[in-house]
């Protein structure tokens, strides 16, 4: 009975866990060419009642990716300063990204190790209203990217920029961290920020003040370490510290000329004084060159062979001339060596043989003669030179 109750409790807990882990779905409508910002608030993933605030000690981190892919799409970025602060998904979709995209977000509770999933259905559409051909980009060094992404500071920047760009309605086109543009990580000193690039667009032309700031003369002064040419009051200060030496203006009101398509020709070059075509080469007979290349090495090899044969065959002294030039004593000694060698070979062939003559005392090694047997061998000196 107790085992059955335990299994029932486990099954109920499993169903509750499956119900809690079911992903929520939110539909969003980003616009092509306009900045898109979606905050990932802790309250959304903790599912707390409305009257209960999120505890400040709760730590949540997020992981977002495109459905069916390990990472986010190329136009979308994610940032979160710390687990105590909310995360942000931001970016500017391009015309190639138009359509439907599903972003899966997983929240991790670092204290209780709970996970919560959320699906963001992005329906990317074209913006309504007039085009924004006049675009200006500013580098704000007094803020980090997550400090500008909320709507309040972004609207405050547009309102302050209206003092420099009086006419027309301003809209945010893109927000990029300076670190993504090759900026350096600031030192851990109070007041140092990473910096953020903010691109703003409008349907009205640039003001005279902005044109003067982005003029070549102003850039030349910045290169020399002097302040830029700012003829109007800086309405962005002191809330936004803009680097006026990094202001870029883009005018897309004039359509760019289309690249001329090259027309294919007939393949025949016209008369050109700088083009010298190669002359026609006359026919050549390579038989003589081939004979010289083959016959000369063969003749040289044949002459060397004949010379070597003459030296080896015709320049020998001969055995008779060699024997006549050799002394008799040396010849006898040579013959004795050969005779002794043959005698030793015969002795090795059979065991019981008489003593060799060369070992007998009556045998003269030099002359080869033998003493008479009647001579007493005891009186024969061992060394013949002694008598």
Curated annotation (Swiss-Prot):
- This protein's record includes keyword Transmembrane: yes
Which keywords does this chain's UniProt record carry? Answer: Cell membrane, Cytoplasm, Cytoskeleton, Glycoprotein, Membrane, Phosphoprotein, Signal, Transmembrane, Transmembrane helix
Tissues in which the UniProt entry reports expression: Strongly expressed in skeletal and heart muscle.
Show which residues sit on the Extracellular side of the membrane.
24-290
Principal localization? membrane
Record field: transmembrane: 291-311
Report the protein's function: Component of the sarcoglycan complex, a subcomplex of the dystrophin-glycoprotein complex which forms a link between the F-actin cytoskeleton and the extracellular matrix.
**What name does UniProt use for this protein?**
Alpha-sarcoglycan
What is the originating organism of this protein?
Answer: Mesocricetus auratus (Golden hamster)
Q: Which gene name belongs to this protein? A: SGCA
């Amino acid at each position: 009975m107790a085992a059955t109750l335990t299994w029932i409790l486990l099954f109920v807990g499993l169903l509750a866990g499956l119900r809690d882990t079911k992903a929520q779905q939110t539909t969003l409508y980003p616009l092509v060419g306009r900045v898109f910002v979606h905050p990932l608030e802790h309250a959304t993933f903790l599912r707390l009642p409305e009257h209960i605030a999120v505890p400040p000690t709760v730590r949540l981190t997020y992981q977002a990716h495109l459905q069916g892919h390990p990472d986010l799409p190329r136009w979308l970025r994610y940032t979160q300063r710390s687990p105590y602060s909310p995360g942000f998904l931001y970016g500017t979709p391009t015309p190639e990204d138009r359509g439907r995209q599903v972003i899966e977000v997983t929240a991790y509770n670092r204290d209780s190790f709970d996970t919560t999933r959320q699906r963001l259905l992005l329906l990317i559409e074209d913006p309504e209203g007039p085009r924004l051909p006049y675009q200006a980009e500013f580098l704000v060094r007094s803020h980090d990217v997550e400090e500008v992404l909320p709507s309040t500071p972004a609207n405050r920047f547009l309102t302050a920029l209206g003092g420099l760009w009086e006419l027309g309605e301003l809209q945010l086109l893109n927000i990029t961290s300076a670190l993504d543009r090759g900026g350096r990580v600031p030192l851990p000193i109070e007041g140092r920020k990473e910096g953020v690039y903010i691109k703003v667009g409008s349907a009205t032309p640039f003001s005279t003040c902005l044109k003067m700031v982005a003029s070549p003369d102003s850039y030349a002064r910045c290169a020399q370490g002097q302040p830029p040419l700012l003829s109007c009051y800086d309405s962005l200060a002191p809330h936004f510290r803009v680097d006026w030496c990094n202001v870029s203006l883009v005018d897309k009101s004039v359509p760019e000329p289309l690249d001329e398509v090259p027309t294919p020709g007939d393949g025949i070059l016209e008369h050109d004084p700088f083009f010298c075509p190669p002359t026609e080469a006359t026919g050549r007979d390579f038989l003589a060159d081939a004979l010289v290349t083959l016959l000369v090495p063969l003749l040289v090899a044949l002459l060397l062979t004949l010379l070597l044969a003459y030296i080896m065959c015709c320049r020998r002294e001969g055995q008779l001339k060699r024997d006549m030039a050799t002394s008799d004593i040396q010849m006898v000694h040579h013959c004795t060596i050969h005779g002794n060698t043959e005698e030793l070979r015969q002795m090795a062939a059979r065991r019981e043989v008489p003593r060799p003559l060369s070992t007998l005392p009556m045998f003269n090694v030099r002359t080869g003669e033998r003493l008479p047997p009647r001579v007493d061998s005891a009186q024969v000196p061992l060394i013949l030179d002694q008598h």
